[in-house]
From Swiss-Prot:
GO cellular component: cytosol
HAMAP family per record: PurH
Gene name linked to the record: purH
CDD domains: IMPCH
Domain MGS-like: 1-148
Organism: Aliivibrio fischeri (strain MJ11)
One annotated GO biological process: 'de novo' IMP biosynthetic process
Protein's name in the database: Bifunctional purine biosynthesis protein PurH
EC number: 2.1.2.3, 3.5.4.10
Pfam families: AICARFT_IMPCHas, MGS
Gene Ontology molecular function: IMP cyclohydrolase activity; phosphoribosylaminoimidazolecarboxamide formyltransferase activity
Length: 530
């Protein structure tokens, strides 16, 4: 049985008019009758395309400032009518079949994102007729084609030309899926917006506050790739991304070469890239199992890589390397000659570096593009039966935010190192301890249940690599509940500590620092990472 359906009549009504004139012209040239509404109809007519206004077709005018345009039985009957089953009733009521619906919706997201948008503005950008037509056409995809995305226009025309002006059921079904995804996303945005409104009907009264967290949490992600497996080989997995991510990230990165990214590759690459974004100077971050094992700055990325690698060459094997500058030939050569690496990611990659890395055909090389500022958004964590939602941790301190609480003031060099290792500690799993000196990590202690043991591990790692802890700065992602961590740090040779403060025993901890002649800096900001 031939499941192709010819396109003889199309209804076109779009808010985003990208490519619509060319698409409508192509349909008209193929003998398709075009129905349209409002601004779309005027635009097509101005371009010399023959078009019938929906109001002329239905005999019912647009009204209520355009709120009622397509909500009419002659429109929805033409879209929903089942060919071969409803033909008689359609003919009885003068309803012509509509074979294609081309609709995208009022720009609700763009409207509410504008500064000064009122609830009234938002309400007037809630599309009613559009989603109704989209859902009607998608429901009746057995007979009707629905097109909601401009990037599908060329695909439709190409298939019509190859298939006697018809489209297959497979194509109609695929376009119907896109349509339901489109309306689901649209309704989710509206629900999120209204879900953050204060009880006083959108009018802020004294004492009212808007919540940034809606009553229901609606977000839509598009599947970018299926994976061989997840975190472990017995777990199925896929990678989903935001529809239009604004910030350079692992989600937006272009893979230049190498094997397909695994679940763990993506998680680790995200950790490495987000950490390296914290630095303005040329920087390198090496990550293993989502923890930085080496971070350093340099006069160029080759020097930064060399110094980051020295922190923990053992853990760097099979790791992820991220840079905040273009990957050049010299750095690519140093990496490929020195170590096995799973992924390299950088804002850009030189042509010479691409050629060098090509010799390691399995190495995954990613180019993510430049970034300027970080976008706001939510972090989510799945728990059994629920979802934890919070702001992204974009908190960071400057020198002006720091409070020196010890008798000894930090030197200028210690202060610089303190700010450096504080940035690193933010990306180390709690309990996190970082030793650093000269804009280079010396030891990293991650993920221990006891903060003092994280400090011990940082010292052990430094000793294993022959790195000198004496004179280092220590960063802790959270406060020290007891003085034992400070005593252990002093014994290891730490001269300056940066930490949030806020413990019930802060006075005891500060006393310990003073006893050991250490400088201690409070940030007033914690960076737990679980």
């Amino acid at each position: 049985m031939n499941n192709a359906r010819p396109i003889r009549r199309a209804l076109i009504s779009v808010s985003d008019k990208t490519g619509i004139v060319e698409f409508a012209q192509a349909l008209a040239e193929r003998g398709v009758d075009i129905l349209s509404t409002g601004g779309t109809a005027r635009l097509l007519a101005e371009k010399g395309i023959s078009v019938t206004e929906v109001s002329d077709y239905t005999g019912f005018p647009e009204m209520m400032d355009g709120r009622v345009k397509t909500l009419h039985p002659k429109v929805h009957g033409g879209v929903l009518g089942r060919r071969g089953q409803d033909d008689g009733i359609m003919e009885q009521h003068g309803i012509n079949p509509i074979d294609m619906v081309v609709v995208n919706l009022y720009p609700f997201a763009e409207t509410v994102a504008k500064e000064g948008c009122t609830l009234a503005d938002a309400v007037e950008n809630i599309d009613i007729g559009g989603p109704t037509m989209v859902r009607s056409a998608a429901k009746n995809h057995k007979d009707v084609t629905i097109v909601v995305n401009a990037h599908d226009y060329d695909r439709v025309i190409t298939e019509m030309d190859a298939n006697e002006k018809s489209l297959t059921l497979e194509t109609r079904f695929d376009l119907a899926i896109a349509a339901f995804e489109h309306t689901a996303s649209y309704d989710g945005m509206i629900a999120n917006y209204f879900g953050t409104m204060v009880p006083s009907y959108g009018e802020n009264k004294e004492g009212d506050e808007e919540s940034k967290f809606p009553r229901t949490f609606n977000q839509q992600f598009e599947k970018k790739q299926d994976m061989r497996y997840g975190e472990n080989s017995h777990q199925a997995a896929a990678f989903y991304v935001e529809a239009n991510p604004e910030e350079a990230s692992v989600s937006t990165a272009r893979q230049i070469q190498g094997k397909a990214l695994s679940y763990n590759n993506i998680a680790d690459t995200d950790a490495a890239l987000e950490c390296v974004k914290e630095f303005d100077e040329p920087a390198c971050v090496i990550v293993k199992h989502a923890n930085p094992c080496g971070v350093a700055l340099g006069k160029n990325i080759l020097e930064a890589y060399d110094r980051a690698f020295k922190t923990d060459p053992t853990s760097a094997f099979g790791g992820i390397i991220a840079f905040n500058r273009e990957l050049d030939a010299a750095t690519a050569t140093a990496i490929t000659e020195r170590q096995f690496v799973e992924v390299i990611i950088a804002p850009s990659v030189s042509a010479e570096a691409v050629e060098i890395v090509a010799a390691k055909k399995n190495l995954r090389l990613l180019e993510c593009g430049e970034w300027t500022t970080k976008t706001t958004g939510f972090d989510v964590k799945r728990v059994n039966g629920g979802l934890l939602v919070q702001d992204r941790d974009q908190g960071m301190v400057s020198e002006d935010d720091l409070q020196v609480v010890s008798k000894r003031q930090p030197t200028a060099e210690e202060l610089k190192d303190a700010l450096f290792c504080w940035k690193v500690a933010k990306y180390v799993k709690s309990n996190a301890i970082v030793y650093s000196k000269g804009d280079m990590t010396i030891g990293v202690g991650a993920g221990q249940m006891s903060r003092v043991y994280s400090a011990k591990i940082a010292g052990i790692k430094a000793a294993d690599e022959g790195l000198q802890v004496e004179g280092c700065v220590m960063a802790s992602d959270a406060f020290f509940p007891f003085r034992d961590g400070i005593d252990a740090a002093a014994e290891a040779g730490i001269k300056c500590v940066i930490q949030p403060g806020g413990s019930m025993r802060d006075n005891e901890v500060i006393e310990a620092a003073d006893e050991h002649g250490m400088a201690m800096i409070f940030t007033g900001m914690r960076h737990f990472r679980h």
